[in-house]
Amino acid sequence: MKKLLLLTTVLGFALSTAFAADEPGFVSLFNGKDTDGWKSRRADGHNSWSIEGGILKNTVNKGEHGTDLVTNKKFWNFTVRYEYQVPDNSNSGFYLRGRHELQILGDYKSGKPSKGGGNGAIYNHTAPSDFASKPAGEWQTVEATIIGNKITVTLNGKKIHDGVVCDKATGSEIDGKVNEPGPIFLQGDHGTVWFRNLRMKELPKD
């Protein structure tokens, strides 16, 4: 069993680094082994994160709250690529610069974007232009680019935001300093979510 777990972890790590290596300019944000380069948003928060097979898992039981993970490094203009998986009705978020939330929601059964939100929405700001969610238990892929105050997002191969101007924080942000660099922030206080293959390419300042 220990050998199998070790093999799974090694394979997961190899896969995460291979993605970045095959994409010129991209670097891995998560090494597949530990949370080096990341920190808890709240030191006193319940640690709901674990790592298994190169996957970063946030497991939150009903009635509980986890804690958010934030990169130590801050960024300005960049393209970020990642994969995530959620159960039905689970709720999480991926924050650009720690202030602009790309909503993660297990809403596949609804068959359409929620009014003003839903999976892939810029939370509290702009709903996705198309319904691109996959069923619970399937890996979903995202490419998000932020340049200045403009955000472009492709979810599962469909462009759902194209140069959307977002000049304000969208809620639960680390701070309101939208004109300054900020970290990547994985929301962990709402629901169960899994991430893998997080990688980024920093872009020139606008």
Label each residue range with its predicted role.
Residues 6-7, 21:
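Amphipathic/hydrophobic helical signal segments and adjacent flexible N-terminal regions
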Residues 19-206:
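Carbohydrate-interacting regions of secretory-pathway proteins
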Residues 7-16:
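Bacterial N-terminal signal peptides
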Residues 1-4:
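Positively charged n-region of N-terminal signal peptides that target proteins for export
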